[in-house]
A protein has these predicted regions:
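Transmembrane-helix boundary motif in ABC transporter permease subunits
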Residues: 91-122, 135, 143, 291-297
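Interhelical loop and adjacent transmembrane-helix boundary motif
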Residues: 231-281
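Transmembrane alpha-helices
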Residues: 174-175, 197-235
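C-terminal transmembrane helix and the adjacent membrane-cytosol boundary/short C-terminal tail
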Residues: 176-180, 184, 191, 261-305
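Periplasmic/extracellular loop-to-transmembrane helix junction in inner-membrane transport proteins
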Residues: 9-25, 47-92, 111, 115, ...
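Generic hydrophobic transmembrane alpha-helix motif, especially the helices
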Residues: 123-163
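Glycine/proline-centered hinge or cleavage motifs at structural transition points of membrane proteins
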Residues: 129, 193-194, 207
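Transmembrane alpha-helical segments of polytopic membrane transport and secretion proteins
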Residues: 1-31, 291-305
Length: 305
């Protein structure tokens, strides 16, 4: 083999390099497709949602802060649904958080062997469809609330009970991962200094996993805020500002699921529902932003250590 043939052989692309280029091209194509799909969804929802204000002439201030939702009377105040969504989301997260932390501490710190029993039970909750949660809420939670607190049983309280069970697995598993990520020498150092196991759990382990727990709670809130079918079946779907936890109310998702099939595309009644969807989308993006900020702050703290 002369020098020229040897140079051509060495400089020609190998099979591995061609496969690497093919892999990079496929990865870039998949990434581009995902970005395009997300961008198209954002543009479509924004275009339809903003048509309410720029095409149909609905005042954006009246839409966001109006207390009356009556499409037949051309009154499109979304405040009752916005408040309803926030109330059920925040309260269900507040109730689910201590249960999730307790379950996570039990599985990681108290009885890791017990996780073999508890974890499959929690995983079972993840696989239950939303409609089943809603049906159970309709048959069990609503009659219970009606018997104990009076009224129809439909309302914020029933929605809180259903969402509490639905977001509990998410918050629990993410909290468990955060506790397991705490370095072992943190616990050993605390115990070596004379702290009890519960003092170590409370003052060291939970404190070190705090940002991860916050992330878990925000993830749970994002899940609760976007839930539609289950909450629609138990909340009562009354688009008025809730005066108590036991009175019927409505959320952004419940109004969307009930109204989107009863309107004509391009009409003000349809566009205003897309405006509700735009508000819902903005809130989802806000939740994602909060999660990124918490994760970024946790990364800085870990780097500082």
């Amino acid at each position: 083999m002369n020098q020229e043939e040897l140079s051509k052989k060495l400089l020609s692309p190998s099979k591995n390099s061609r496969l690497e280029k093919l892999g990079k091209s496929l990865t870039f194509a998949c990434l581009s497709l995902i970005v395009i799909i997300v961008a198209m969804i954002l543009i479509f929802v924004a275009q339809k949602g903003l048509s309410t204000f720029f095409v149909n002439g609905v005042n954006i201030f009246d839409f966001l802060f109006g207390a009356t939702w009556n499409p037949s009377g051309k009154q499109f105040g979304a405040l009752p649904m916005i408040l309803g969504s926030f109330i059920v989301t925040i309260l269900s997260a507040l109730i689910a958080t201590p249960f999730a932390i307790g379950a996570a501490v039990f599985m990681t710190e108290v009885s890791p062997k017990g996780a073999k029993i508890l974890q499959p039970a929690i995983e079972l909750l993840v696989g239950i469809p939303s409609v089943v949660y809603g049906f159970i809420g309709l048959q069990v939670v609503v009659p219970f609330v009606r018997t104990v607190f009076g009224g129809t049983g439909f309302g914020i309280l029933s929605g809180i009970f259903v969402l509490f069970v639905m977001i509990l697995p998410t918050v629990t598993f993410m909290t468990t991962d955060s506790l397991r990520a705490v370095p072992r020498h943190y616990r050993e150092a605390s115990l070596a200094m004379g702290a009890t196991r519960w003092q170590t759990i409370w003052r060291v382990t939970l404190k070190a996993a705090r940002s991860g727990i916050f992330t878990a709670v925000v993830f749970g809130m994002a899940r609760a805020f976007g839930e539609a079918l289950a909450i629609q079946m138990v909340v009562g779907n009354s688009a008025v500002i809730p005066t108590s936890l036991t009175t019927p109310a409505a959320t952004l998702t419940s109004v969307l699921t009930m109204g989107i099939g009863n309107t004509v595309m391009g009409t003000v009644d349809n566009n205003v529902l897309w405006s509700l969807a735009l508000v819902l989308l903005m809130m989802s993006l806000a939740f994602n932003r909060v999660i990124k900020l918490i994760t970024k702050e946790r990364g800085k703290k870990n780097y500082a250590r």
